[in-house]
């Protein structure tokens, strides 16, 4: 019994360093918010301007890697000897469900406004050209390219899970073929795992920082409760307590049901927006945007704007590529685990087609609705953002739809459930990654899960206290830098091991 408790306890070398690092950074930030904002702006400017090109080349190289997997020697290799665990329809649905987070609802509703008001390629703000490129850029940032990069990492993790039969809960476990067992399980592997965990903590705190204002703004619209930072903190605290109760009382089945409800409600809400907003315009705008994407794709791939220095690729493309990089390992592990028994080609094609369809539907419907509301002068987004913040502007794009009260209730429930499942997933992932030998199907210790959910909640509150999108963008970019190298090492380790051990 003692031995079992020891096995499921924390792993000090990957538990305490991230905890201490993140705790110190939060303390320094809260101590002087103005100084923290100065540092944040400097970090954002340095990384995006000096190293933005590296993120763009990373995505392009990983895209070529996707083609190599689909048409190369491993295309017909099966990831495990068992038949697929899920039907193709269920598999695709699970992929869609993974895309319906509150952060996705945040960006899907407001992103097009930023692209139109501060457009790329020297276009005039709010011009016809800017509007024509608005949705096309969303389809670029949330389309086949990033999902192709995830395909490569998902194949790598599925290979280590189901072909090599490895227990992978941290990235260092996959680096034995590349770095050797001594280094992968030694100091080098510990450093890699700590980079991963610090970045993941900030990424999850960022998602909470995006999701919480949506819920509190919904509460203000529905119940008249003023949206304040204190209310944000109270709501985050309630989510943490609710998560602790669910875990302590064995209500994980309830959380899974909530996740399913979130997915079905997402379909319902998107269908409603599509019908009442203007189905004909949405389909025409989407079709035109696909054409614009194909026409501008080469420039989008390599756009760094070093001459005009307008800042668009740094503020958006590099930011989003860092976003994809920082979530790559966590997301790829999930996608790999639900893809047992499929061939490499099936996994690559299924991910790119299924997940691209998911994100394209979300961004097309929500972005088109926002554009229509702007063009018809139904809402004034710049004024809303200036007076009340981005979250209020997003809420108003939903409140402007017919049957506004019912629509807002649906959106409120969707955001609330999405954030409950987010906090649960955050605490579970971090607890699994910082505990010793917690195998698949086992639960990490309750106190560890609660502790991590509290820390993620604190980060969300700190980012909200800083105000604006720049702190959130900087947290993602800073976290994406070390994981940029970790993702590359995992990929190279897979290639090296597969060449030696995955032969006919």
Curated annotation (Swiss-Prot):
Pathway: Amine and polyamine metabolism; carnitine metabolism. Coiled coil: none annotated. GO terms for molecular function: (R)-carnitine:4-(trimethylammonio)butanoate antiporter activity. Keywords: Antiport, Cell inner membrane, Cell membrane, Membrane, Transmembrane, Transmembrane helix, Transport. GO terms for cellular component: plasma membrane. Homotrimer. HAMAP family: CaiT. This is L-carnitine/gamma-butyrobetaine antiporter. It comes from Shigella flexneri.
């Amino acid at each position: 019994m003692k031995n079992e408790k020891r096995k499921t306890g924390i792993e000090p070398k990957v538990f305490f360093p991230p905890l201490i690092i993140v705790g110190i950074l939060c303390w320094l930030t809260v101590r002087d918010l103005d100084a923290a904002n100065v540092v944040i702006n400097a970090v954002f400017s340095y990384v995006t301007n000096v190293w933005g090109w590296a993120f763009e080349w990373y995505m392009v190289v990983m895209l070529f890697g996707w083609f190599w997997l689909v048409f190369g020697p491993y295309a017909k290799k099966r990831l495990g000897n068992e038949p697929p665990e899920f039907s193709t329809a269920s598999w695709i649905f699970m992929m869609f469900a993974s895309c319906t987070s509150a952060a996705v609802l945040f960006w899907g509703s407001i992103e097009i406004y930023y692209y139109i008001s501060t457009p790329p390629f020297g276009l005039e703000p709010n011009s016809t050209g800017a509007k024509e490129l608005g949705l096309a850029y969303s389809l670029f940032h949330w389309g086949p390219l990033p999902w192709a990069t995830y395909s490569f990492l998902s194949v790598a993790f599925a290979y280590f899970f189901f072909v090599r039969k490895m227990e992978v809960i941290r990235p260092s476990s996959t680096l034995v073929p590349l770095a050797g067992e001594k280094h992968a399980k030694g100091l080098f592997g510990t450093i890699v795992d700590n980079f991963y965990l610090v970045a993941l903590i900030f990424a999850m705190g960022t998602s909470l920082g995006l999701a919480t204002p949506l819920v509190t703004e919904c509460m203000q619209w529905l119940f008249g409760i003023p949206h304040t930072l204190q209310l944000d903190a109270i709501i985050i605290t309630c989510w943490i307590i609710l998560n602790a109760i669910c875990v302590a009382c064995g209500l994980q089945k309830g959380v899974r049901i909530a996740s399913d409800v979130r997915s079905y409600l997402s379909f319902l809400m998107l269908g409603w927006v599509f019908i009442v907003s203007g189905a004909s315009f949405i389909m025409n705008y989407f079709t035109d945007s696909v054409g614009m994407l194909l026409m501008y794709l080469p420039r989008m791939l390599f756009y760094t704007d070093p001459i005009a220095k307008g800042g668009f690729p740094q503020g958006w493309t590099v930011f989003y590529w860092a976003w994809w990089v920082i979530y790559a390992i966590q997301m790829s592990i999930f996608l790999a685990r639900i893809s047992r028994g499929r061939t490499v080609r099936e996994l690559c094609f299924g991910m790119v087609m299924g997940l691209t369809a998911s994100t394209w539907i979300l961004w097309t419907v929500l972005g088109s609705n926002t554009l229509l509301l702007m063009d018809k002068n139904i809402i004034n987004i710049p004024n809303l953002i200036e007076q009340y913040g981005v979250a209020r502007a997003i809420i108003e794009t939903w409140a402007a739809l017919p049957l506004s009260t019912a629509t807002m209730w649906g959106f409120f429930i969707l955001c609330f459930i999405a954030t409950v499942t987010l906090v649960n997933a955050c605490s579970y992932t971090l607890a699994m990654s910082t505990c010793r030998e917690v195998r698949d199907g086992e639960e990490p210790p309750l106190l560890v899960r609660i502790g991590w959910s509290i820390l993620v909640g604190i980060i969300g509150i700190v980012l909200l206290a800083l105000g604006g999108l720049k702190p959130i963008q900087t947290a993602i970019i800073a976290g994406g830098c070390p994981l940029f190298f970790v993702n590359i090492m995992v990929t190279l380790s897979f290639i090296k091991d597969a060449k030696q051990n995955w032969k006919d």
